[in-house]
Design a protein with these regions (language model features):
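Aromatic-anchored segments of alpha-helical transmembrane domains
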Residues: 1, 68-69, 139-152, 191-205, ...
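Solvent-exposed interhelical
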Residues: 120-143, 172-190
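Juxtamembrane membrane-water interface segments that cap and precede transmembrane helices
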Residues: 9-16, 91-105, 267-278
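Alpha-helical transmembrane segments of multi-pass membrane proteins
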Residues: 1-6, 73-76, 252
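Alpha-helical transmembrane segments of multi-pass integral membrane proteins
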Residues: 205-309
Length: 326
């Protein structure tokens, strides 16, 4: 009975941890797309179509399709080899049962690497309508509301609609956001106003506030600025340079290491042990993230040579310097 109680508490802890991760992810993604828009700003505003069509949009769509197919094949193979059956019912291109289902889910951005698809679409729209950036921002804000309230169906289209507004802010209003993120007296009133606006949607039972996401962006920028003042941030820069291989490869390693570890623990009835359940609940998320990240970088280091470079960069860009950027 005591073992069952401990196991239940560990399960509740994992459930609460999952909810926390979902909340953090919901606030992290706006910051990611804001920074992506900031980095794409010069290409969108100053560079001609001829110079950026392949290096930006074509490259992003190419990587999205390529790694979507690789993940689908690898995850299907891993699931079949280890369990002999499909164990996930997630609506995701990586778990598609047929080729037509894979294509449909990929087109709908219901793929693990959906953010590559989103960046390509955002870049295209921002470039096309850069002279009408304010109306485009307002449209993006409306799309954000429709996505958050799930008026737009399916999680893939919802994701595409939800984060466009933050890419727009990074592209066309980054200077204002960066100034607002500084700890200055004159920024006190705007911050207070944002705090009030961030809490207002709760009165109307909205799922998530656009203003709360903007606050998360400001806090993230301010935190990074503060850390950069007291540390070299070399480790964070290293992670940033390897974001693409870590992101596209980690899903495959999560399936392999995760399923292998879970099946091993079940086979030896380790989850019946209270100490193991708590150890698993506390350490597994950290260990699996570190293990998958290191494995992803290792594979990238081994394959990012010669023809293998086409796994991470559109073939016609291989001879050009610079790592694929958002």
């Amino acid at each position: 009975m005591q073992t069952l109680s401990n196991g239940t508490r560990a399960h509740e802890y994992l459930a609460n941890l999952s909810d926390l991760i979902q909340l953090i992810s919901g606030l992290f993604m706006p910051a990611f797309f804001f920074v992506s828009g900031l980095l794409a700003r010069n290409a969108i505003i100053d560079r001609p179509w001829k110079r950026i069509a392949t290096s930006r949009m074509t490259n992003l769509f190419y990587l999205y399709l390529l790694w979507g197919a690789i993940q689908w094949g690898a995850i299907t193979g891993i699931s079949t080899e280890i369990t002999g059956q499909r164990i996930s019912q997630n609506i995701n291109a990586a778990y598609a049962g047929t080729f037509s289902e894979f294509l449909t889910l990929t087109f709908l951005a219901m793929s693990t690497s959906w953010y590559l698809y989103a960046l390509g679409i955002y870049f295209l729209l921002a470039k096309l309508f850069q002279r009408y950036n304010l109306p485009l921002l307002l449209m993006a804000a409306v799309l954000n509301y429709l996505a958050v309230e799930k008026i737009i169906p399916y999680w893939g289209p919802q994701s595409l609609a939800q984060y466009f507004v933050f890419f727009m802010l990074g592209t066309f209003w980054c200077s204002q956001i960066l100034r607002l993120s500084e700890w200055r007296r004159q920024n006190g009133l705007p911050w207070l106003l944002l705090l009030l606006l961030a809490g207002l949607p709760a009165l109307f039972d909205f799922d998530r506030s656009l203003f709360l996401s903007v606050l998360a962006i400001l806090i993230s920028v301010a935190a990074c600025r503060g850390l950069n003042q007291v540390s070299s941030m070399a480790w964070l820069n290293w992670i940033g340079r390897h974001t693409l291989p870590i992101y596209v490869l980690h899903r495959i390693f999560i399936e392999y290491f995760g399923m292998t570890a879970i099946l091993f623990a079940q086979r030896h009835q380790l989850f019946a042990l209270a100490w193991f359940s708590w150890l698993w609940a506390c350490l597994y998320p950290l260990v699996i993230v570190a293990l998958c990240s290191l494995a992803s970088v290792a594979v990238w280091s081994l394959t990012n040579h010669g023809v293998g470079r086409a796994l991470f960069r559109f073939p016609t860009l291989i001879k050009r310097p610079a790592y694929p950027a958002a």
